[in-house]
């Protein structure tokens, strides 16, 4: 998979997406993440990518043409049109199911918004999907783009050492993850559940499923309602 990110602040992504697991995946060739400086596609002497909104109002809007030129350049670089995502508080809230679907997409381009948003004409003509990471507003789309890119990347085959690394996690199957424990078996008088040390895989699996349901009912009852509808 290749992920292209259009942003005013490419330097923000370096320590997040080029280190640890995702960094290793890029070095191995399983994943490629490329950041594009939007100002490189603004051709006035001040490299402006924003302007005042028609009709008045607070703040500035990102102009359509620099974004269009940058996206068209991305298309030329990869030889095809990628799925174009705009990180926006107006978008659909990102869910694990959508990540599973997008993990099969070979090329994805992410637009990071800034200021008061983006000229609607650009959104209408170019954007395939708007995605939000929650019902709140941030100062820009860079942090949401990092969240999306990280969550998406780990779903790509070969990024994690074993698919069970994510198939056992919260949200993947519609439930929250079961409690987990490590050594020592007794910590400050608190013991690890005996079943986990029994070596009986069927009983362990049964315990984990029951605990996942308990945890989900306690912390996210609305998720359990959806799970029970399946």
What is the role of each PLM region?
Residues 1-75, 197-225:
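N-terminal nucleotide/polyanion-binding subdomain common to many enzyme families
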Residues 4-6, 34-36, 85, 108-109, ...:
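Hydrophobic/aromatic beta-strand patches that form the interior of the parallel beta-sheet core
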Residues 38-41, 114-118:
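Short glycine-enriched loops at secondary-structure junctions
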Residues 46, 96-98, 121-123:
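Short, well-ordered secondary-structure micro-motifs
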Residues 63-114:
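S-adenosyl-L-methionine/SAH cofactor-binding core of RNA-modifying enzymes
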Residues 89-90, 170, 218-230:
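Charge-dense polyanion-binding interfaces
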Residues 122-169:
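Structured adenosyl-cofactor binding patch, chiefly the S-adenosyl-L-methionine
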Residues 143, 155-194:
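Internal, active-site/partner-interface "lid" segment
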């Amino acid at each position: 998979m290749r992920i292209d990110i259009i942003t005013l602040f490419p330097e923000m992504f370096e320590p997040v997406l080029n280190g640890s697991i995702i960094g290793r995946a890029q070095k191995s060739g399983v994943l490629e993440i490329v950041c594009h400086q939007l100002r490189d596609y603004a051709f006035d002497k001040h490299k402006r990518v924003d302007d005042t909104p028609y009709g008045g109002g607070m703040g500035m809007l990102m102009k359509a043409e620099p974004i269009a030129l940058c996206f068209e350049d991305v298309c030329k670089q990869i030889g095809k049109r990628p799925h174009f995502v705009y990180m926006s508080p107006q978008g659909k809230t990102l869910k694990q199911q959508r990540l599973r679907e997008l993990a099969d997409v070979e090329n994805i381009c992410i637009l990071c918004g800034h200021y008061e948003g983006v000229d609607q004409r650009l959104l209408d003509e170019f954007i395939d999907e708007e995605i939000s990471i929650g019902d709140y507003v941030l100062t820009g789309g860079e942090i949401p783009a990092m969240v999306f890119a990280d969550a998406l990347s780990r779903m790509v085959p070969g990024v994690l050492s074993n698919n069970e690394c994510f198939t056992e996690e919260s949200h993947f199957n519609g439930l929250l993850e079961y409690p987990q424990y490590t050594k020592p078996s007794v910590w400050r008088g608190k013991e690890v559940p005996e079943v986990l040390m029994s070596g009986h895989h069927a009983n362990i699996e049964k315990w984990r499923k029951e605990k996942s349901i308990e945890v989900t009912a306690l912390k996210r009852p609305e998720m359990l309602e959806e799970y029970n509808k399946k």
